[in-house]
Amino acid sequence: MKRRLLFLFAVFMVATSVGWGQTDLYVSTSGSDGNGGGVEAPLATIAKAIEKAADGATIRVAEGIYPQVSPIVIPKSITIIGSDSTNCIIEGQLDIQRDEEESVINVNLRNLQITKATTLSQGLINVMSKNVNLNLSGVHLHQLTAGSGDGWGKSSMGIVNLGKSYDSNSICDNVNVSLTNSCI
């Protein structure tokens, strides 16, 4: 009896722990946000993958176009890797905004195309917290169009360091941006 209970407990622990330590999540245009995020059951949106990911996880994005209605908020250390920078396209903006500003956040973006910030203000990638290391490798930022009436003027930028407010007193300390084979 004890062996049987021990065996059932072990099976239960293994079955319920699947995905808890998952460091790689997968996103595909054919996925569903109700999926677990594994290679065989990818998620549909990058935002959902970020929500499900542990701090320091890697999100692997399949070829496709990923339109965003609102900015994708990145509140933790994460790596997002696209299949390639020509065919893996995020249409929208990324806001890097950590709640715990005393710790460092490392955001690595690779092999992605980030484009069309036409209805959004600021830039395509907005650093809104201090202590951020942003690393871009094989990332292309383009088709920037400024918003109107929000004080941002006639042009928009690829990467903007905003701080927590949008006035002249906004300062982000200790923000590092590293570019490798990237086009801004």
PLM regions and their residue ranges:
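Positively charged n-region of N-terminal signal peptides that target proteins for export
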Residues: 1-4
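Right-handed parallel beta-helix/beta-solenoid
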Residues: 18-48, 65, 83
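Extracellular beta-strand-rich solenoid/capping regions of secreted or surface-exposed proteins
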Residues: 47, 52-55, 67-81, 89-135, ...
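Extended, compositionally simple hydrophobic/Ser/Thr-rich segments
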Residues: 166-170
